[in-house]
Amino acid sequence: MFIGITQRLICNDSYHEKRECLALDWGKLFNKDLFKNFTPLPLSYEIDFSYYKHLIKAVILSGGNDLSFYSPNVLSKKRDLYEKQVIEICLEEKIPLLGICRGAQMIAHYFNSHISPCENHIGKHEVFFSKEKFISNSFHNFAIEKLGEDLVELCLAKDNTIEAFKHKYENIFGIMWHIERENGLNNIQILKEWFSLIKE
């Protein structure tokens, strides 16, 4: 089963070329037993997402690039427009959607959450989930302070910013840590819940 993944956008100045890319960590992640039933399908921003929707069973909005709302550059704007379409089609077609770091921020922003600059979210830190806590990686300059009314928190950081959430009614989850990087799978309960929504 294919899981579509949005990609980071970069500009290679020496070649005057805009590029889509995914970290090699994503390939390593899909080699793990947890992902053995799935194959990643990188999504191109030059191909309308409606073309992909019949090929995939779920979508991951990956990390990289700040939202254009906070970093108004051409690449961020292009990515925001595409991922907005992805969210809307996933809602229409009931396609399970997972946001990772920037992807979680994109979903949170779409559903009217409050996002602001943060400090001390680089490296690793404690995450509080129900009555448990675990260590996760952390690589973001913006944090979700308050969720929109359609979203519910699942995990918090020590500063009470949102580390994970889900939609109250739709098949949508957001995680602020990078599942593909070191300390990304120290707690997989939320990931397993999202997997349970994916139908063959």
Curated annotation (Swiss-Prot):
Q: What is its EC number?
A: 3.5.1.129
UniProt keyword Hydrolase, yes or no = yes
Give every Glutamine amidotransferase type-1 domain span. Answer: 20-200
Active site: residue positions:
C101, H178, E180
Keywords carried by this UniProt record: Capsule biogenesis/degradation, Hydrolase
Q: What class of enzyme is it?
A: hydrolase
What is the protein name for this chain?
Gamma-glutamyl-CDP-amidate hydrolase
